[in-house]
Amino acid sequence: MFNNDKDDNNQGNENNENNKINIKTSIDMGNYINSSSLVESFGSGSNRNNDKSEDVEYDDDDDDDDDEIASTEEEKESDLDSDSDLAPTQIIVDDSDDFYNNNNGGGGGGGNEDISSTSPTLITSNSFNDKINQIFSRGGSSLNSSFLNNGENKINFKQLVKLKSTLKKHEIPSRELTVEKEIGQGFFGKVYKARWRGKSVALKKITLIKFRDLTETEIFDKEVSIMSKLCHPTCVMFIGACSLDGPSNDRSIIMEYMEGGSLRRLLDEKSSYHLPPSLQLSIARDIAEGMNYLHTNFKEGPIVHRDLTSSNILLNSSYTVAKINDFGLSKEMKPGPTEMTAAMGSLAWMAPECFKAENYTEKVDVYSFAIILWEIVTCRDPYNGMEPLRLAFLASVEDYRLPLNGFPPYWVELISKCWNITPSLRPSFKEILQILNQIESDPLFLNLNLNCSSNNTSSGSTSTSSGSSSSSDNNLTKSSESNNNLRESNINNQIKSNKNSSKNGYYAQDINDYSLSMQVETKNCIYNNVSDNVNNNNNNNNNNNNDNDFFKSSFTKKSFLSNNNYNNNNNNINNKNNNTNNLNDNLIIKSLNHISEQNSFLVSYQDSNIVKYFSLDNESLTSTLQMEQSVVCMKYQIINEKVFLVVAMSNNNISLFELKKTDFSGSANSPTTLLPIKVIKCDEQRHTIKDITWNGTHVITSSFKDSSIQIWDLEKSLYPISKMDNGGVGILSIDSQSHQPLMISGDSDGKVKLWDIRNSHCFRTLTHSPPSSSSGGSIGVDSVLFRSPHAVRDPIILTGSSKDCKFKVWNMYSSTCLNSFQSHNKDLLGIHRNQSSQQMITWSSEGTISLFNSGNNINNQNNQNNNNDCGNDNDSVEFSKVLNVNSMMSNEPLQSAQIISKNRIIFSSKNKFYSIIA
C-alpha cells in the first residue's frame, strides 16, 4: 500500500545503523489499533518520525484486509520479516509546505539532548524565531493565552462555524470539493488537502473495509457521530461529510485544515533543541483544555479519546494553537454500567491498564497526556531507544517510566501525577489546567522563560545583521554536546528507583539507557551421528568429562508400564515394572500432558476417547477418563486453584471439564465417564480444529483447513468472538501466555506470527525457515512455544520445524534470533519446556531427545524490580546434551515427550511410556 520515504539528510544514523529492527512510528508493532490521523507532511529530508523504521524491509504476507497495511518490497534473507510492523499512521511528503523549506537544513541533528540544562535553547529555524519574536513582543516574557484565543485562530474558527451552519445534515456535495493532494495516511484511510468554498480543508477518506466486525459504514458513522458533537477551539473542527463520485462511492469526512502539521512533526524536526518554556506551556494548556471539554461537556458522559498522541495534536502555521484530532477510536461513555477493556491507541502512549486489557476509564487519556508532556520538554520520541512492545510490557508490568532527570520541578510533579500507576490518583484535566496556571506564575518558569526570550531576541538581531542563521545557531546549545558526558557517567547505573511508585517501579536514568542496537549473532549447533548407547554404555563413556564433546548420554532410566525389562548395572538402571494390563495394547499413545501443579500427567491416545491419569507421586495409573469423542488436542489451566481441561474432539466440539480429585479416585481398569461443564460446537465444514491453546481467559483454536484462528469466550458466548484470517496460509501450531493477550502461530510457509487477540491483529512476523528450492518449497513451523507461559516479563519464544529439524530461540521484543540448533537428523516432532527447572527439550521419532537450559533464571528476574532490566535481550538458551533412547523402546518410533522436573523426562512409544533422569 505504501513504503517509507528515505531521508537523505538523516543525521545520527551511526547510532541507529545496528538497530534496524526497532519500529518506532506512532503505533509500531502491536498495532494496538491506531486510527487514521491527519499527519502533516515534511519537506525533503525531514521525515524524522519514520527514520527509526525506514531501514526495515516490509514483506507482504498477510492477505487479510483488516491487518494488511504494508506493501511488498524485494525480499531479503533476514531472520526478521516485519511485514506487519509498519505503522498505520504514515507521514507523506508534502513539498508545498512553505514553512519547511531548504533553509531548515533537513532537520536538526540526531544527537543526544542534555535535558538537564537550566537554560533551554530555542529551535533554530529563522522563520520560527521570527514568529516567536512577534509573540514575545506582544506578550512579554510569557505567551498570553487570551491573545491566542482572540487572534487568528478565533477568526478562522468563527468563519468555519459560519460556513458549517449553511449545511444540511452535514452533507457537502462532492462537486464543491477540489482535492489537491494526499497529505497523510492512517489505519482507517487516507487524508487529503482540499478546497471548499475558498477555504483549505482536510478530507479524510475511509478505505478500510472492515475493522473488529465493524463495516466501513459503521466506522464512518461512529467517527461522524462523535466529531459532529464537538465545537471547541482546541478540537479540530468537523465540517461535514460527503460521498465522493466514483464506482467505490467512498465516504469522506471534511475537517478543519491545520497548516502547522502535527506536534510530532515539529518535535522530530527540532529534536536537537528545546522548545521555549512558554510554547511548552501553551501547547500543554491547549491540549488540556480540549481534553477537559471532551471529558466534562457532555451530559451523556465523557468522550474518551483513547489515542491521544503527539501525532494526533495538530498545530496552526505559527505553532501558537494546538488542536486535538482523530476521533476514530474515541468512545462515548454512556450512563449506566460501562466497561472498556479493548486495547486502543499507540503503544508508547497507552496506559498500563489499557495494555493489560483491564477495565479502564477516561483516565487513560491523562496517562497519554503525561507522555506528550515528556515529548514537549525533550523534543524526543517516547520510545526512548526501546523496542515498542518491550516498552509497553515494562510500563504495564514493572511500572517503568521515561526519564525525568534534568526536568524543571514543576514538570516533574505534573508528569508524575498524570502517569501514576493507579488511574484514580491521576488528576482530571480540570485539575491539570489549574496546575498549568500555577506553573505560569512559578518563579523558575518565569526565569527560564525570560532567559529564553533574551536568547531568542539576541539571536534574532544577530541573524538580521549577518543575513544568515549561523550566528544565531552559535548561541544555541545542542543537546548532543553535553549529554554524551551524562550518558557515560550513567552507563553502569541505568535504572533509578522511583520512591514515589506504589509498585516499587523505576525510571530510566538516561534517554538512551535501553538502546537495542546490539545484534546477537545466531549460532548453529549441528551433530552428525548419534550412536545408540543406552544399553551399550560402559564406564568409560560415563566417566568422559571432555567438555568439548557435543554428545553426552549418561542417564538413569525408569520404565513405566513397559513390557521391557532392562538389566544393565553399568547404566545405573532403576527398574520399576507396573501391571501392563493397565494399558490396552491396542491403544497407541498420542500425547503426554504434564500437570505440574498436581505432579501428574494425562495420556491421550490416537483415535480414542480414553484419557488416562498418571500420578507421579506413586508412579501409577489412578484413573481412566472417558470422553464423548476421540481427543484431537487438549490444554489445561489452573483457575482459582482448580484444574480445568479444554479438549478439542474429533466431532469438532470444544468441551470444558473440571478435573476434580474425585475423578481420579477410581480404578484405572474401570473408566470414569467425565461430563463436560460446557460444550461449544465448532463449524466442522470450515474450521476443522488442528490445535488449541488456552490463556485462562479465551480458548484459541487454529485450523489448517480454512487458515484461520478463532477466539472463544467460554463464559459469555457459544460462538467465536473474533476470527483472525491467516491469508490462506495453513496454521500448524499455536501457543499463548496465561491471562495475556499475546499468542503465536507457526505457519506452513515457514513464518512465525505474533498476534494481539484483543484486536485480532498480527503485529509481527518472523521467518523461521525461508523458502528453499533444495527443500522443495517452504518448511513449515510445526512447534511454537512461549518459554515462560506465566511470566509476562520473559520475551523468549521457541520455534521448531520437523522438516529441517531446526530449533530456534527468539527475542520477541527485538525480533532477534538468539540461537539456532540443528537438534535432530530425521525430524523434530515437538518442543516442551519446564518453567520451574528452566529447561526444555525437543524430540525426534528417530529416538533422540535434546536437552537445553535457559541462559538466565526467569524466576529470579521476576523477583527483581529495581536493579534488573526485564526483558534480558541476551537471555539465550544453551544446549546441554542429546539422549538416545532407541534401545529402551526396542527401536520403535518415539512419539511424545515431556520434561517434568530438573533433568527428568518422560516419553512414549506405541502403548508404553518411560522416564529417564538425564
Swiss-Prot record:
TM regions (residue ranges): none
Reactions catalysed according to its record: L-tyrosyl-[protein] + ATP = O-phospho-L-tyrosyl-[protein] + ADP + H(+)
Protein name: Probable tyrosine-protein kinase DDB_G0283397
Organism of provenance: Dictyostelium discoideum (Social amoeba)
Residues annotated as domain Protein kinase: 177-445
Enzyme class per UniProt: transferase
GO biological process, one term: signal transduction
Residues at which ATP binds: I183, G184, Q185, G186, F187, F188, G189, K190, V191, K204
Keywords attached to this entry: ATP-binding, Kinase, Nucleotide-binding, Repeat, Transferase, Tyrosine-protein kinase, WD repeat
